[in-house]
Amino acid sequence: MKTSTALVLLLALTATSASSGDHQFIDEQNIMNVAEGKNVISSLSSSGGGDDAAAIMESVLVNGGNRKMVFMMVSGSQANCIPTGQPCGVLHQCCDGNFCTDPFYGTCTVKHCVPKGQPCGVLHPCCEGMCPDPIYGTCR
């Protein structure tokens, strides 16, 4: 969960166009703190603290960030998820636990699992346990 959150937050960072290097540094620092599970206290917030996502959203919006990206950061990927058979990617995640065949130009596919003794990898997860190798593993 933290990895996907960090990825979305880092993509939000690249989508921003800050007017000052200081603001960009604040965004990077906030994003890294959230990725590490730390509480973010935004200097922009009038309340002096609070929800991590709200602090980052406010910071990104003040610095000219992408509103769609901020919405995804706050609402999660299921708010505007992509149904099975439709184009997907990092910014357009699949619904109901299905997976995307490619991070940029993929298609939402029904999630399936591989039984013990069969080849597994990132796109072919094991039904029981973890795949020992992300590309050329065998389910144990």
From Swiss-Prot:
The keyword Phosphoprotein is assigned to this record: no
Q: In which tissues is it expressed?
A: Expressed in trichomes, that are stiff epidermal hairs located on the surface of petioles and leaves.
What does the record list as GO biological process? defense response
SS bond list: 81-95, 88-100, 94-108, 113-127, 120-131, 126-139
Q: What is the protein's major site of localization? A: secreted
Instruction: Report the leader peptide range.
Output: 1-18
Q: Which residues form the propeptide?
A: 19-78
Give its localization: Secreted
* Any one GO CC term of the record: extracellular region
> Any idea which GO molecular function terms this record carries?
sodium channel regulator activity; toxin activity
Q: Give the protein's biological function.
A: Plant defense neurotoxin that causes pain and systemic symptoms in mammals via modulation of voltage-gated sodium channels (Nav). Potent modulator of human Nav1.5/SCN5A (EC(50)=55 nM), Nav1.6/SCN8A (EC(50)=0.86 nM), and Nav1.7/SCN9A (EC(50)=208 nM), where it shifts the activation threshold to more negative potentials and delays fast inactivation. Also shifts the voltage-dependence of steady-state fast inactivation of Nav1.6/SCN8A, but not that of Nav1.5/SCN5A or Nav1.7/SCN9A. On Nav1.7/SCN9A, principally acts by binding to extracellular loops of domain IV (Nav site 3).
Q: What is known of its domains?
A: The presence of 'disulfide through disulfide knots' structurally defines this protein as a knottin. This toxin contains 2 'disulfide through disulfide knots'.
Member of which family?
Belongs to the urticatoxin-2 family.
Name recorded for this polypeptide: Beta/delta-urticatoxin-De2a
Organism, scientific name = Dendrocnide excelsa (Giant stinging tree)
